[in-house]
From Swiss-Prot:
Transmembrane segments: none annotated. Coiled coil: none annotated. GO terms for biological process: defense response; negative regulation of nitric-oxide synthase activity. It comes from Crinia signifera (Common eastern froglet). Expressed by the skin glands. This is Signiferin-4.3. It comes from the Eukaryota.
Length: 17
């Protein structure tokens, strides 16, 4: 769901920082 996509996006952003 949207929560899964949001969580995945957060992980992606964190991995780039």
């Amino acid at each position: 769901g949207f929560a899964d996509l949001f969580g995945k996006a957060v992980d992606f952003i964190k991995s780039r920082v």
